[in-house]
């Protein structure tokens, strides 16, 4: 099944529902990151979570989620762009833990940044609620963005350590709320088989939405393909080096003679010889 996100509206626009499959891009990203089993599960969930949280993006917009905690993973980042491009990284990819909450740590913060093309991006932050990625994202959406939300995320690993399935769903109640419909959907969610079981059985995102919204009037909206794309470039790295200032560049030239910058997302390395650093320094 190709990676994509499906959308639906229910009860005359009072309920928004989205579901996604991210198996292939999660495997690509985890391979680049060199993740341990628990890091693969955590990162896979975060990638799906970012896709769901960013499901309403318009052209040129971007959403990023960042989990920071005291556990062995330290930091987890997933970003999605309006066209379905996703990337992610984990600070300690070889972390070992018995569960995702243990890997993240009970104390920490979730930061959500929405770049909507305005002068400054909007950033919201909450303390980690349970350190379960789906629950923390739903808590953030409900508490900070004032949109009652329910989210489910699932990742299952194959015997060889690769991701067998990865995906999730997000249900949001929009004003004016239809409490009867919300209660019915929450009852359906409570009786839902494990999400990874549904995904292993080949359930598509649209079929998952039909299951979640059974008995509730709903209609499908557009779907979007999801895929891995980093977006880093030599020009962006040059701008980052220029941000060091003339003094910072001269110090780098004196102490190191060259620069090697590795993208934390795709691991592409960009090298700058002394002459290139000197040219950047002279641009001030």
Curated annotation (Swiss-Prot):
UniProt-annotated location(s): Cytoplasm
GO cellular component: cytoplasm
Pfam families: HSP33
GO BP annotations, alphabetical order: protein refolding
Gene3D superfamilies in alphabetical order: Hsp33 domain, HSP33 redox switch-like
MF annotations from Gene Ontology: protein folding chaperone; unfolded protein binding
Disulphide connectivity of cysteines: 230-232, 263-266
Keyword field: Chaperone, Cytoplasm, Disulfide bond, Redox-active center, Zinc
Post-translational modification comment from the UniProt entry: Under oxidizing conditions two disulfide bonds are formed involving the reactive cysteines. Under reducing conditions zinc is bound to the reactive cysteines and the protein is inactive.
InterPro entries: Heat_shock_Hsp33, Heat_shock_Hsp33_C, Heat_shock_Hsp33_N
Chief location: cytoplasm
Family: Belongs to the HSP33 family.
Function comment: Redox regulated molecular chaperone. Protects both thermally unfolding and oxidatively damaged proteins from irreversible aggregation. Plays an important role in the bacterial defense system toward oxidative stress.
Entry protein name: 33 kDa chaperonin
Organism whose genome encodes this protein: Trichlorobacter lovleyi (strain ATCC BAA-1151 / DSM 17278 / SZ)
